[in-house]
Amino acid sequence: STAQLRAIDSADIAAIDTSDLGALNSAQIRALSTAQIDALTTTQLTSLGSADLQALTSAQLRVLSTDDLNSLTTEQFAAFTTSQVNSLTTGQVQNLESADLQALSTAQVRALTTEQIVAFDSADIGALTSGQFAALSTAQLRAIDSADIAAIDTADLGALGSAQWRAFTTAQIDALTTSQLTSLGSADLQALTSAQLRVLSTDDLNSLTTEQFAAFTTAQIASLTTTQAQNLESADIQALSTAQARALTTEQVAAFDSADIAALTSGQFAALTTAQLRAIDSADIAAIDTADLGALGSTQWRAFTTAQIDALTTT
């Protein structure tokens, strides 16, 4: 009976043959005390079948040591229920082997608590598969330590959806490496919020390809800081569509230096609003190509300030 099983001295548990353990039913497994479970040898643990493992209570599971858990096969680990995975201590989760982590189903991964995710180190984060990353909730993603963000494989980042991208904190976005950033597709980039975009450094933005830069929405372009706009590479500026160029704020245009102004194409100049044209620093007027000036309409010409007109060169 269950009472008889609980009466077995913990010191004698190791003497139980694996075939005898296998003969126990779920109710009998659950009847074992935590001290008895803790006394099981790794040989006994590795002999347990899926039904035996699934019979373990949360309290019983939590007494298993790192060596106990790591002695289990990936098939055994994959047999745990979502409730059991959810019940593991942060200390247990932190010391799981990569193979065990990868054996978790998407349902098991989604059952991980945010406290368990926080306990993961970079090796644990790096071990997760693309399918597992795609299954993570927004709360779980936000729980990843910023110091571990660089460990995420580019394929895993590519598996994330727009809502997941928007869930990242600015500190996490700031922790992305240039290799990770250059791997992002158009949908990933367009999912970034204004706050997330504004934490990208000059090197981050300049690491993006012109195709990636051209993928930003007009709202995202308008959200860039003046410092970010000021330090854009000429190729990125030229990659802007006319709609994106028209989305630039007057503060961003005012922050442009002569090299930035010179980088604008005739099509982009023709798309600028009168307010944007008036925002160009008079000191940068000389950098405007004659072909760009030729693309301007009458209304745009009339928008120039007298100081800007005075800055035009004779050529």
Regions from the language model: what does each represent?
Residues 1-315:
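General marker for long, soluble alpha-helical cores
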